[in-house]
């Protein structure tokens, strides 16, 4: 289990309660389903440093942690230095949108516990990301 997986597990404890799900309409995808979905992708995606990945409803990072793990492994030949490889993945390949500020803080702690990376996280509803606000009524 990676450091990020352990941190995610810690953040999930007590967070994914019925009350939280009811109040925030949050339901987290179980890791085994994420693995199953990602297994359907062409294996070459894990060794391509030019690919970008978007999690439009990032939550606590369930998808991102597993994608990060696969990219760290798949990009070894491209970048042998593990620290530079992880930095490239987190700063240039992974992008997140999450509208719950509490979840964003937890996501930052999971992916960047020591604050060393510049993560790409927008605390906003993905469906309105990049739209100009308008006062017009339709």
Predicted regions and their residues:
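SAM-dependent methyltransferase catalytic region
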Residues: 2-138
